[in-house]
Amino acid sequence: MLFVLSGCAGELSMLDPAGPAASSQYWVWWVLLGVSLVVAMVVFVLWFYTFWRKEVPQRTMQEERRIMLRWVLGGGVILPVVCIIGLLVFAAPTGRGMLPLPLAAGEPERIEVVGHQWWWEVRYPGEGEEPDVITANRLVMPAGEPVDFRIISADVIHAFWIPRLGGKRDMVPGRASTIRLEADEPGVFGAQCAEFCGAQHTHMLLQVEAVEREAYDAWLAERRAPPQLSPEHDQAQAAFGEHCAACHTVAGFPDTLINAAMDHAIEGPDLTDIGSRPNLGAGVLPMEEGAIAYWLQHHQTLKPGNRMPPHNHIDRETLEQIGAWLEALQP
């Protein structure tokens, strides 16, 4: 048993809870495992006893029927009903804890998460005249307080799951749902789409960072200030407007540089702060110098089937210039 459980460690393990919902699920898991083992042991003991007993007692037909009825009622009805009701009563508070119920004081932070094939869009709605903060494949949340995640899918069914904080919840196209999670303390947690959504399902990772409230507010304020476009990247910005701006957005990017002849359907990730993200392609490449240029040149090899078309018509030098500029987009 210990050998098997040793494979349950890691950042995607629910056996290392870091929040109230995950802690409740942790205990439900252990209780369910314990009850299952006890029932399995009883069944195996009775099964072995049936084969190993040396003498079979002689009974009348009526006695045999009474014994059979006891086993059917006891083992087939009473025991399952008692176990299931007990587990439901024990587990009910866990599900209730993840519902967006009114809090005793204040309002929870709200974050929107949209699942795409195969990446995550994360939105922080602004209040009043504040602009929304939009990022991708990285989720920053305040620690020590409940957060309501409004989740939806843009294409197929996905599932939002942060094992160490709780979950999971299906993301259904056209239907929004809400799940409430909380991180006990600051930390970095792994998240993964938990519903098969196509060829690159396994390459749909989300890095979750829980930070103190002050750091969270500062992070949002930095993202709401559009990045300053440096003159040293003029050629890269012109190339981005020509080839990339039909699908991707950078806050503050001048409309005059966007190729008006192209169909504009923003279907790719917002790239406003891409240089500060921990990885590319939802976990395919670590973010390091030259990584974006390499991704632009080889993305269909690194993540086959992703919706960004090949860039065979763009020379390598131009792709490297675009990559260098995008890496510089950091608050």
Regions found by a protein language model. Give the residues of each.
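Short, solvent-exposed mixed-charge patches
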Residues: 8, 330-331
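Aromatic- and Gly/Pro-enriched helix-to-coil junctions and flexible linker segments
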Residues: 324-329
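Membrane-entry segments of alpha-helical transmembrane domains in multi-pass membrane proteins
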Residues: 21-42
